């Protein structure tokens, strides 16, 4: 018996709708397009056209599979990703549009690096993308959609892609042949880094398994029953892969290398904690189209590592939630800062953030940038800023030297360095915030007549810092009452109160940057 396109589509739409498929009409058309090999436009225009018995039989078989909740991508054997169709089957994760953010980030970083010295001489984005070659490692390539998209967009790039699944590797190789990139990709059967030589890479990228087993019951039937669990679920509350990458990645990165990873939308704080504790910087957290945290950009601290602890006592659930949801809004970046027109003050090592929050509250038209690697303190600032509706601040929970690289010269109206660790033992003094080289950098960041405030409750450290400033800095002391009088709007912090209770006297050095050329 023959049926028209309209009858077939209507019947399929009703059946798919009955089992809760979100877009039943569209999926019915996709299945029929796959069977007839005719464009959807043709199917919509020729609704009264009769289908052959063979076409109807083939369509019904595919529809039965979809009614059993098999993903449509597996049924038709392809899935679009980054404007290209990739071969997929039950051995690989189905590409998601959220993962395209990861590809965007890597391309953006390549463009940014090439722009540093070439953009003014180039005429097109294509020229920027082909200027310099890059070596990329992808961990857990699956279908190869990430690696192959990068190869297609970045012609001078070479990639090594690994996967633990032999069947997934076959799919990735088929896609590399489809897009004619086999000469620039090496696909290796490896469990993470195990089979790699000691090659160095510009970027390590991965969309690792990150779903905890406890979330399984909340997931769609078609995902649980059909997609490979090894590509979805991870131990350690979904964080196992991030720990493996954090532990091993440094030895495979070039000096300026980056790690770009997809994360679950509620995992930013937990993943950040893992990498911070392994000696990395969290450079940026990117959001997807639904404004969920989706991709994290990471770089090793190397010789510029911070000596402070990243975590004091364990983060509470509330603190983790604040770091996940609020920190990305207030995370310092060059992009956020470059168009800044307000007065700007930098506080280095803000501790629990009492001073930073108070200054921001009293001076709503001024931007305050806080640097602190201690995540409990960062979470405390986010908590109190939300309670008091304070938004005129940015946070940098990383090493000081990294933000100094991103701040333009002559951009700061003031710098606060309040009660930094004195590192009293001689062999530890190299860890102090102040040294000759960093002092020069700090004064260059200050505007002419900008202020630097230094405070310490350790008398020897205070006067050693003063001697260093007098010998190497272009500053004038603008306040002197035996250095006991703090700057305007100062509040006694918990640390300062502890010093008072211990009979230690806090001294404040208030300096003005003398007129000089930058």
UniProtKB/Swiss-Prot annotation:
Annotated region (HemK), positions in chain: 1-300
Residues at the catalytic site: 421
InterPro entries: DNA_methylase_N6_adenine_CS, HemK-like, N5-glutamine_MTase, PrmC_N, RF_methyltr_PrmC, SAM-dependent_MTases_sf, Small_mtfrase_dom, tRNA_(Gua-N-7)_MeTrfase_Trmb
Region annotation tRNA (guanine-N(7)-)-methyltransferase: where it falls in the sequence: 301-518
Swiss-Prot/TrEMBL catalytic activity: L-glutaminyl-[peptide chain release factor] + S-adenosyl-L-methionine = N(5)-methyl-L-glutaminyl-[peptide chain release factor] + S-adenosyl-L-homocysteine + H(+); guanosine(46) in tRNA + S-adenosyl-L-methionine = N(7)-methylguanosine(46) in tRNA + S-adenosyl-L-homocysteine
EC numbers for this chain: 2.1.1.297, 2.1.1.33
Keyword Protein biosynthesis among UniProt keywords: no
Region tRNA MTase, annotated ranges: 305-518
Record-listed S-adenosyl-L-methionine binding positions: 140-144, 163, 192, 207, 347, 372, 399, 421
Annotated family: In the C-terminal section; belongs to the class I-like SAM-binding methyltransferase superfamily. TrmB family. In the N-terminal section; belongs to the protein N5-glutamine methyltransferase family. PrmC subfamily.
Record PANTHER family: HEMK METHYLTRANSFERASE, MTRF1L RELEASE FACTOR GLUTAMINE METHYLTRANSFERASE
Protein name: Bifunctional methyltransferase
Native source species: Rickettsia prowazekii (strain Madrid E)
Organism ancestry: Bacteria, Pseudomonadati, Pseudomonadota, Alphaproteobacteria, Rickettsiales
């Amino acid at each position: 018996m023959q049926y028209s396109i309209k009858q077939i589509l209507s019947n399929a739409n009703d059946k798919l709708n009955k089992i809760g498929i979100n877009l039943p009409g569209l999926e019915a058309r996709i299945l029929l397009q796959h069977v007839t090999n005719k464009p959807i436009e043709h199917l919509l225009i020729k609704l009264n056209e009769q289908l052959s018995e063979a076409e109807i039989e083939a369509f019904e078989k595919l529809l039965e599979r979809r009614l059993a909740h098999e993903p449509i991508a597996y049924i038709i054997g392809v899935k679009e990703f980054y404007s290209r169709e990739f071969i997929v089957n039950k051995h690989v994760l189905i590409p998601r549009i959220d993962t395209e953010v990861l590809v965007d980030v890597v391309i953006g970083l390549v463009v940014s690096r090439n722009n540093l010295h070439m953009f003014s001489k180039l005429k097109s984005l294509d020229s920027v993308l082909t200027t310099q070659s890059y070596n990329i490692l992808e961990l857990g390539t699956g279908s190869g959609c990430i690696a192959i998209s990068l190869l297609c967009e970045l012609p001078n790039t070479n990639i090594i892609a690994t996967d633990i699944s032999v069947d997934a590797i076959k799919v990735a190789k088929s896609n590399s042949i489809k897009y004619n990139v086999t000469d620039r990709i090496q696909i290796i059967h490896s469990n993470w880094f195990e089979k790699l030589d000691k090659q160095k890479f510009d970027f390590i990228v991965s969309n690792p398994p990150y779903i905890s087993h406890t979330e399984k019951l909340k997931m769609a039937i078609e995902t649980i029953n059909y997609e490979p669990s090894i590509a979805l679920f991870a131990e350690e509350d979904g964080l196992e892969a991030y720990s493996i990458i954090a532990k091993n990645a440094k030895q495979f990165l070039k000096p300026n290398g980056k790690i770009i990873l997809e994360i679950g939308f509620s995992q930013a704080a937990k993943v950040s904690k893992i990498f911070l504790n392994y000696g990395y910087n969290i450079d940026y957290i990117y959001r997807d189209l639904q404004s969920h945290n989706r991709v994290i950009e990471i770089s090793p601290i190397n010789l510029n590592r911070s000596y402070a602890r990243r975590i004091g006592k364990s983060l509470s659930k509330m603190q983790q939630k604040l770091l996940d949801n609020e920190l990305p809004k207030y995370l310092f970046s060059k992009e956020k800062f470059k168009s800044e027109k307000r007065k700007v003050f930098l506080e280095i090592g803000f501790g629990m953030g009492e001073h930073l929050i108070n200054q921001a509250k009293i001076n709503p038209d001024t931007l305050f940038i806080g640097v602190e690697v201690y995540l409990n303190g960062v979470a405390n600032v986010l908590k109190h800023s939300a309670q008091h509706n304070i938004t005129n601040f940015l946070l940098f929970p990383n090493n000081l030297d990294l933000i100094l690289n991103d701040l333009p010269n002559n951009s700061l109206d003031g710098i606060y360095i309040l009660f930094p660790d004195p590192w009293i033992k001689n062999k530890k003094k190299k860890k102090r915030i102040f040294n000759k080289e960093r002092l020069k950098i700090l004064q260059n960041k200050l505007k002419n007549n900008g202020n630097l405030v230094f405070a310490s409750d350790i008398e020897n450290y205070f006067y050693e810092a003063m001697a260093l400033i007098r010998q190497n800095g272009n500053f004038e002391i603008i306040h002197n009452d035996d250095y006991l009088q703090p700057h305007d709007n100062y509040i006694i912090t918990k640390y300062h109160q502890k010093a008072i209770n211990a009979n230690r006297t806090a001294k404040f050095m208030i300096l003005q940057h003398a007129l000089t050329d930058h």
